[in-house]
Amino acid sequence: MHNVSSSKPTINEIGIVDVAFGRDVTVVKPVNMYGCTIGDDCFVGPFVEIQNNTKIGDRSRVQSHCFICELVTIGEDCFIGHGVMFINDSFEMGKPARGHKELWVPT
C-alpha cells in the first residue's frame, strides 16, 4: 500500500488569456490559448495550444490536439488537421535556437 500525502498539488490553469477573437468563433475546451488573434468564423478544437503573437486567418479550422508555436501565421480558409504541430524551426545557426528567443523569426 502507498502512503497518501495530505498535501495538495500545484495546479496551473491557463485556458484562454489575452486572445483577440473575431466574429462567430467556436472553441471547444480544454484549450490553452494566450496572446493570439483568431479571425472571423474560425473553429478551434479541444486539446489545442496556440501561443503568443500567433494569428489564425478567417474561416480557418484547427482540429484537436494541435500545437501552434509563437510567431506563426496561418492564412484564411486553412484546415489544420488533427495533431498538427507548427514550431518556430528556422535554424539559421545550423541548430535549434532553444533558449534564444531573439533569434526566432515569424513563420
Language-model features and meaning:
Residues 2-17, 26-107:
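Flexible, glycine/small-residue-enriched loop-and-beta-strand segment within the central core
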Residues 20:
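Detector for the N-terminal beta1/A-loop initiation region of ABC nucleotide-binding domains
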